[in-house]
Amino acid sequence: MDMNQYLDVFIDESKEHLQTCNEKLLLLEKDPTDLQLVHDIFRAAHTLKGMSATMGYTDLAHLTHLLENVLDAIRNGDMEVTSDWLDILFEALDHLETMVQSIIDGGDGKRDISEVSAKLDVNGAHAESAASAEPAEAQSSASDWEYDEFERTVIQEAEEQGFKRYEIKISLNENCMLKAVRVYMVFEKLNEVGEVAKTIPSAEVLETEDFGTDFQVCFLTHQSAEDIEQLINGVSEIEHVEVIQGAPLTSAEKPEESKQEDSPAAAVPAKQEKQKQPAKNDEQAKHSAGGSKTIRVNIDRLDSLMNLFEELVIDRGRLEQIAKELEHNELTETVERMTRISGDLQSIILNMRMVPVETVFNRFPRMIRQLQKELNKKIELSIIGAETELDRTVIDEIGDPLVHLIRNSIDHGIEAPETRLQKGKPESGKVVLKAYHSGNHVFIEVEDDGAGLNRKKILEKALERGVITEKEAETLEDNQIYELIFAPGFSTADQISDISGRGVGLDVVKNKLESLGGSVSVKSAEGQGSLFSIQLPLTLSIISVLLIKLEEETFAIPISSIIETAVIDRKDILQTHDREVIDFRGHIVPVVYLKEEFKIEDTRKDAEQLHIIVVKKGDKPTAFVVDSFIGQQEVVLKSLGDYLTNVFAISGATILGDGEVALIIDCNALII
């Protein structure tokens, strides 16, 4: 069998299982008595081990096997969760991630894991011996199912939630060449509709193919016996399937209480914890049993689909214009129907490309844990807006810039605990990672309450490196000085000690974000902290806009940025702090004249009434003054090309139905 056809699936699922292990281990560090977390990590490691063995990645399979032994020892009460032991587990995960990355890069996934294997063997030797003894015992009484305390607890709670327990006997064809592959395929099928609780022989024996043609599975599901049998028979080279529904496990069947007294008390809190959350577990169980159906699609195919749809939108706009000119009722109705249908199609296509930023954010708690240990600092990380969605192609690229900014916040921004106490700050530094939509952009902010940027030292270093001249230095405002840290001249190692707060390689961050069509800016208050703000395009090439007029020119404003449109009297505009504002629903909102911003001659200065559009960036509103509103329309966002990359407050252009080109306004650049 050619395993290359499964490689993409293996890589995607391996990354998901490793992420699960990382997240659950961080939670386990906070609550070492929660055995449900141990069980979740065990399941992820077990699945990864089976996949790795099937694909032939022996180092991956071996290391996850050792990981599994230790986790099994914990859930059986033979080991306790300690900080040192968690460090070893995290180290093992680092090796696993490196091996998976090697496979992604076209390598063989091999790595020297002797050192970490020795650490895991020391901690899990007794678990290994117990695991190795299990197959012989299981095979000697293959028809008698015996469950340990943890397995019994899991099964009983599943039965209380309405699950059925099936004991399934499966026979493979005598001529089956890849028994482990067939077993893996059976498990994949079963895991779509329930959960495999136990196997005879053990999973390790099944993976090494050290068994005959028969194996047994204890399976928990809502499905009927007939459905399960049909599901398994869908796998090739299955000779026979026998599905028997087991009688519910009762408390009378539990081992004697004396056994529980001999084992650590950690097993009891795990059960109590799970009883506290029946609704959550039940919801998860139903979701698992339901088996949501997904399909993996190459991103290039989605790009091609989007390109074709863009052409459809352009033609649709042209048809709308023709229907308007001809004033033909049937044509108008047909175009309106096509508009509605294509609008639904557009939403589906765009949503297919969108991924929540939590796929990137999830790596940072683990990174911060490691940095705390290395730097002897205490950090509290807050993540806000992880559900914010961004195009997949952008998501794949923003990880490294964010890692760089967060490392800078912790390494050079947050002070040591004793220094913070001397300054009257809490001992633990705070880092806030926030994401939110604004118009056709996503903003990601990294904020800390550390030392902030040292204005004087930044200026000194900028002059020393020749980034600016002394004459320029005299005229720079604070925010312009802070922006100097993104200059290439600052990306040298000695900047760590010379500039209080930031300075290493931030030009790389800026270049990367600009290559994605985004930007980065910084605000800081010395002694109070810094805020780095990343602006990224949603890369939604088809957007809904409001067309407006400025003199004879047509412009477009993204609907997603607009709060409201209105017509007001000129006398309603107030003057405060050298700025013009309006009272908008009880809030003071600054006024921006778009014709002034774009240097368009104003021939209507004496107009008594003004058309305004109230837009927002995050929670900041601003009122744009325009000449008139034309109407709402779906348009294709086009780049201005390489020659017009830095046009102020313009994010792109579009071709309207009548052939006119309209510039699309970047509201975020105009909001104060």
Swiss-Prot record:
Its main location: membrane. One of its GO terms (biological process) is chemotaxis. Residues 542-672 form the CheW-like domain. Residues 253-262, 271-286 have a biased composition (Basic and acidic residues). Residues 290-540 form the Histidine kinase domain. Signal peptide: none annotated. PANTHER family: CHEMOTAXIS PROTEIN CHEA, SENSOR HISTIDINE KINASE CHEA. Involved in the transmission of sensory signals from the chemoreceptors to the flagellar motors. CheA is autophosphorylated; it can transfer its phosphate group to CheB, CheY or CheV. This is Chemotaxis protein CheA. It comes from Bacillus subtilis (strain 168).
